[in-house]
């Protein structure tokens, strides 16, 4: 073998190895497994947590129990909750941006149990991500319906035991009338009671209330409003378990066969934990197509570079083997 051939063999080995490594970064989606999202929505497994097992009437959460929970921060201060959908996309409530919709002002903190990590917590800084772009639902007009927003991050999130994405479904009928779903957040623990230091993430178990019942509850005396089709209610008729101020944008999540799905986004309520005033959430399934199309239009999908890389390498190699 000539000098060209001697150079070519190790080069091809290096290129093939690099191509295999690159291909491994593109997670393959198995349609037979329910815990894997469609490839054009999420790039791999979702809804799994490492810890088995505001919020009014809640308890302190454990680190890693809700690994998709994010703290949406404006100028470094917690304002709303958020959830991680994949390495570049985050879901929250549109009304969080009523006063400031400049992406430069916003970051999302993942992997922390407190909304106020220590200044010396270098790990927290490494898990804080700048917002690149904000996408509000085109139907949102500073009113409660369509209260949903997608955030594109400026850099990809690094997954670990405490940072993982949650799953979405285009239909949440299977969660209707469930009594064992959860709301999480760093909001107030009562209408007149802020979350005390050390500002630990709170969790509370709530029941899904069908819209017909929720409308009936909200039409009782002293306040009347309508529960729209893109809303879902959760709580208890007697009150005491609810999201509160500062929980907006966070997840209402339910599990199915140990896989966790986000059913709703914390949107609004009358007070916090009042009887016959359950929390109202944006129904994820109602906006599933918008979430999907927004991600696709704005750069979620990337062409697989492996075939192109191998083709160009082989073409170049064949040119080297031609007689001089």
From Swiss-Prot:
Residues 55-296 form the Peptidase S1 domain. Glycans are attached at residues 170, 177, 210, 283. Belongs to the peptidase S1 family. It holds the Pfam family Trypsin. It is found in: Cell membrane. It comes from Mus musculus (Mouse). GO terms for molecular function: serine-type endopeptidase activity; serine-type peptidase activity. This is Testisin. Its main location: membrane. The gene is Prss21. It comes from the Eukaryota. SUPFAM superfamilies: Trypsin-like serine proteases. SMART domains: Tryp_SPc (SM00020). It is an enzyme of class 3 (hydrolase). Disulfide bonds join 46-167, 80-96, 181-254, 214-233, 244-272. CDD domains: Tryp_SPc (cd00190). Keywords: Cell membrane, Disulfide bond, Glycoprotein, GPI-anchor, Hydrolase, Lipoprotein, Membrane, Protease, Serine protease, Signal, Zymogen. Could regulate proteolytic events associated with testicular germ cell maturation. Testis. Residues 1-21 form the signal peptide.
